[in-house]
Amino acid sequence: MKSFVAKPSTIERKWYVIDATDMVVGRLASEVAKRLRGKHKPTYTPFMDCGDNIIIVNAEKVRFTGNKRNDKVYYWHSRFPGGLKSITADKELSGNHPERVLEKAIKGMLPKNVLGRQMFRKLNVYKGSEHPHTAQQPEELKLG
């Protein structure tokens, strides 16, 4: 018996919406990354993008375990001398773009190549309870 290999014409993608209220960041991110890759499907093929489209709402209401909300620090560099910048998870969540916390966590769990960037494009994270993807008729996905 030959191994199954998914073709682009046979891949079926569904739309799911997840309410992130009171969900732990890492546990939510690992489940979403698995679904973006398509590893929950029996037709999973490692070199094909066979995952689903995910919409996450209420991204500002996620929670961290322990004291990570104050201790976790995100770093980046401006590429100028002395340009190391940082922000804590608490400031990021209470700032203008709280959805970036979830995006960074999920992006770190995807492959670091062209396929991973293609998978990441199927993720839509919003800070409120509204999203503009009602035309796709997403299914509610309960995690945990």
Curated annotation (Swiss-Prot):
Keywords: Ribonucleoprotein, Ribosomal protein. GO terms for molecular function: mRNA binding; structural constituent of ribosome. Gene3D superfamilies: Ribosomal protein L13 (3.90.1180.10). One of its GO terms (cellular component) is cytosolic large ribosomal subunit. It holds the Pfam family Ribosomal_L13. SUPFAM superfamilies: Ribosomal protein L13. Transmembrane segments: none annotated. GO terms for biological process: negative regulation of translation; translation. Belongs to the universal ribosomal protein uL13 family. This protein is one of the early assembly proteins of the 50S ribosomal subunit, although it is not seen to bind rRNA by itself. It is important during the early stages of 50S assembly. HAMAP family: Ribosomal_uL13 (MF_01366). Part of the 50S ribosomal subunit. NCBIfam families: rplM_bact. This is Large ribosomal subunit protein uL13. The gene is rplM.
